[in-house]
UniProtKB/Swiss-Prot annotation:
It catalyses: ATP + H2O + lipid A-core oligosaccharideSide 1 = ADP + phosphate + lipid A-core oligosaccharideSide 2. The gene is msbA. This is ATP-dependent lipid A-core flippase. GO terms for cellular component: plasma membrane. ATP binds at residues 375-382. One of its GO terms (molecular function) is ATPase-coupled lipid transmembrane transporter activity. Belongs to the ABC transporter superfamily. Lipid exporter (TC 3.A.1.106) family. The keyword Lipoprotein does not apply. The lineage of its organism: Bacteria, Pseudomonadati, Pseudomonadota, Betaproteobacteria, Neisseriales.
Amino acid sequence: MKDSFKNSWAIYRRLLGYLLGYWKVLLLSMLSMAVAALTEPAVAKLLKPLIDGGFVNKDPQVIMWVPLAIIGIYLIRGLAGFINEYTASWLTGQLVQRLRQQMFAKLVNLPARYYDEHQSGRLMSRITNDVNQVTEAGFNVITVTVRDGLTALGMLGLMLTTDWQLTLICLVVMPAVTYCMRLVGQRLRGLARQNQQHMAQMTQVLAESIQCQRAIKVYGGQEREMARFDHTATSVRRNQVKQSAASAANTGVTQLMIACALAAILYFAGLRAQHGGLTAGDFMVFLTAMLGLFAPVKRISSVSQAMQRGLAAAESVFAFIDEPGEPDDGASALPATRGRLSFDAVSFAYPNVDSPALSGIDLEIQPGETVALVGSSGSGKTTLASLVPRFYEPSAGRLLLDGVPLADIPLRQLRGHIALVSQQVELFNDTVAANIAYGREDASREEIVEAARAANAMEFIEGLPDGLETVIGENGARLSGGQRQRLAIARALLKNAPLLILDEATSALDTQSERLVQAALENLMKNRTTIVIAHRLSTIENADRIVVMHQGRLAEQGRHQALLEQGGLYARLHSLQFSEPQAD
């Protein structure tokens, strides 16, 4: 219990830190809340002169000035309420924006391993759903606490000055209400955590159903996906019912205690009135203050529910923000890169996988050399290439560029020397030109066109409705597979980096396009260090060196003809591939 309180306070204190950056607006909001809150006991206080002076003593002056005073108080209350609502909305917007900006900045700087271990649906849910719930634990809770807290204190003070004995009866129920709030609040926080998990699972199913909609249709997976969605939606519904039940229990218990207090107070007030200790005006003031006290106390008691939900969401948000980013401690500048890559006893293992993906790799790639990595699926080709831009860090050994360890080179500078074209093309919902020039915003129109021509892409670009300014849809959904691949190649051509990684770069092209693009790639690879990952061995026969990988190790290396003559693993792969019947 004590550790939980400390953790909650630490989370809440961190949230307040975001708001303190706007302390002037926060102060104005607090002052307007205080003014609006104190108008309620002020109105209740006016009932005594109105009842005793106006109705009992028939004083005409009282009947005139009390209504005017009430109008003035409500004018002040309306202005203060407007200022409070506006500043609260502004502060809430700032809080949400800053959290989302920090989360997105973390998102784009997380290591590749994090994405391997976490579902995309949960990541999206954190940035959208969780951040919205954080505002409940941020400014919304402050608003209710300050506004209703001051109202409650004002009403309580008015009750004490009117009749302290009756006030003591009201205070008897408060410890019991607080105790019940704490018990139910703990339950609500646990249910809020579960709800976030269920919502993330439902978001994941939705995301996969949208991304894989063609596979779902072709393989008849509609019923399976509907069953998955029904399961997650049912979990969300059941959890929300539990939350509603716990919330209703909290509200019901609070209201029952308030009703008991009200009955007791009315009874004792009647006794005091019989003995002349309470005037009609006093009773109306006390009754109005007491009834006015219950509403803010009820809201304060229910604010614990919002706080528990918000704290659970804030815990998730801050855990994401605090995730360690990619290691980037390098300080060695590389003014000019020759492109010599060295793998020195490099090993790598994925988390929770028994066998290593790479074991003791020793490989030297000379400047301007084209090295092809071949092997069966799972042999470690893509993993080895992924170590070059430091998507992953080796478990043992080290990689060097021109004799400088990659870990000593700043990530931005290292990746500035690398161009990548992979089998899984990644495009943005933007224009053709913007996708080609991604990372080269300073590129001229002529450079973009030249890169597109070299990648054999201009022929289809010119046929698009708006040419280079055509928006291609999410991940290039409006283009064919071959067209998307050629845009990715054009992007690599435009970057003109000294290091190239081509991961099945021509796999999505038809035969005619493959020949043209292969010729463009061969021109690009001249005098550049290139790592080519290929399944079709026909595309890498002219490589300077072919490295054959098997179960995470280097099995063979050499030129195409020499490896065939050895009759080893490469020769068997070549024989197997070229003995397969060719598709029409």
